[in-house]
């Protein structure tokens, strides 16, 4: 892979964290009719963002065959910082990401590695859900 901006930061969030957020929202919608029609963002705190290079280093520990090179190109505009404002979800729903950014990257890379090598994804998915439930 070619990496253009290794020091750019990216939010890391696992799909299980997002699904958990929607389950919390659904339960709150049932209890509080004032929330009907409200919109919510679910994303990690900006302080949890990782640099692209750090995401790659974590990924390489899980999948040693991963290779990349840095090639700074100016022809593509790319934001150095990406983020969602999830303050409303945190305040009203008392929601937060349960997985760290490092756990998110590790679980995601582990899943894709097993998928790539045609391993039992259902079993791994169940293990990862159990891991999340124990957080």
Predicted features along the sequence, with ranges:
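C-terminal substrate-binding subdomain of Rossmann-fold SDR/epimerase-dehydratase oxidoreductases
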Residues: 2-135
């Amino acid at each position: 892979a070619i990496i253009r901006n290794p020091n750019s930061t990216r939010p890391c969030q696992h799909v299980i964290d997002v699904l958990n957020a929607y389950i919390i929202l659904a339960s709150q919608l049932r209890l509080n009719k004032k929330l009907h029609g409200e919109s919510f963002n679910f994303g990690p705190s900006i302080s949890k963002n990782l640099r692209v290079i750090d995401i790659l280093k974590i990924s390489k520990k899980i999948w040693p065959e991963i290779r990349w090179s840095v090639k700074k190109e100016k022809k593509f505009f790319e934001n150095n910082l990406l983020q969602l404002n999830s303050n409303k979800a945190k305040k009203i729903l008392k929601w937060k990401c349960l997985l760290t950014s490092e756990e998110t990257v590790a679980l995601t890379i582990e899943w894709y590695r097993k998928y790539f090598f045609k391993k039992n994804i259902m079993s791994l998915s169940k293990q990862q859900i159990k891991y999340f439930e124990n957080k």
